[in-house]
């Protein structure tokens, strides 16, 4: 399904009830499962990734297909590794089976896990023979994915000797690790995080009742719309004292012309004339916001140098290349620097204006949602495979229409072939 998008006839206006946090939902489902599901989670995110996690944790079959859900692949690998007497093969999409997982598997093996590679060494599918994990002292490069760290931490209290985890090579997405430890604390588990060493002693989780907060990553797309339109938008469901590192979106967008102010439990977004002339950011702790910020900067004509993006190459797609290629369709010449940064100093290139702009999403939900607001500047912009947003934000298009955008279902290939 491809969407042709047209902007509101008037200034965008409305209050958005944001979806619940996917990151928190996936963690609390694992934590609750480790208590024997004796706690009560009021609601979880209603997106594909969390649905995959729910299904995998409830089924008893010996094969689990997690589709394109990278978080589920990593968390469930650790979870199933410590289910004695159960053997599970976990697989996913072709892209998922080309995303490396050796660092996590090696770490789990050091903890006593029995895991085999079904096809290619270092990549899913995995055949996991559940057993009691011993734990102990291990070292893990933390520069690739914080989800490896979180997967180990959530299972650590139930390991025979607990876990002393030394992180090397620089820690990416640190707020996600802190989120995991914070949620473990909610379930009664203590930990110590000193310098680059995390220690979790053997202990039991305590069942709790838990309410998941709204998703700050989802909020970022409304900040983008506010920045590009100077509309009148409000966001409901966010937490003031959030565990989510992406709550920094409010700080990032102050330099992009958006101020934020709480009114009770609603975050009001307000236009500001203050634009930072050149944006310089380290987004190593908020990589999921990178696409939104990069596209916003480009559309506002603000040169930028954004670092800390090394993990974007192993996301749903190679997001560095995808951003560079799709922004070039809009005339922006973006440079990838050392596979860790994106830079734009104002260079533009000619574009063919004889046909609609078609944005490829590469089966990446964040590509679709980061580029859709560009329709404010380019009416008739086409987003290919628009339904990919169900991975994290199924209501996205409905919410976009609720503030005046128009979406028309089209076939991008047919349109381009008829020109």
Residue ranges and their predicted role:
Residues 1-419:
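Structural preference for solvent-exposed beta-strand-turn elements
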